[in-house]
From Swiss-Prot:
Keywords carried by this UniProt record: Cytoplasm, Glycerol metabolism, Kinase, Phosphotransferase system, Transferase
SUPFAM superfamilies tied to this protein: PTS system fructose IIA component-like (SSF53062)
Family membership: Belongs to the PEP-utilizing enzyme family.
Lineage of origin: Bacteria, Bacillati, Bacillota, Bacilli, Bacillales
Name under which the protein is recorded: PEP-dependent dihydroxyacetone kinase 1, phosphoryl donor subunit DhaM
GO cellular component, one term: cytoplasm
Pfam families for the chain: EIIA-man
EC number, UniProt record: 2.7.1.121
Keyword hit for Transferase: yes
Amino acid sequence: MAKPYGVVIISHSKDVAKGVHDIIKEIAPDVSITHAGGTEDGRIGTSFDTVNEAIESNEADKVYTFYDLGSAKMNIETVEEISEKEIILFNAPILEGAYATAAQIQMDEKPEVIAANLKTIEIK
């Protein structure tokens, strides 16, 4: 059964994005998890188009997004301006934040509990 919340991983590296995706999919098989890493031409970096595709292709209407560096966050915020999805952005470590969130979504945890837990690992 599809969950109402999904997880989106955004990294400057396609290998990092795919690796985080693979790790969290193991513990959250029912959660829609999408990712984008690198630029369209395979270089290190991020782009609006790949970030937009990762967010829009997620099956959930509400997505928690996790990123590695500043321009990834900037692209998420830009997509947020045009997307009809509810985009939830925390400044949490990409692996730990995504893993903890996906596990809690898998267990049908309430969004306010997920948010409270993410705040404990948030990077300020």
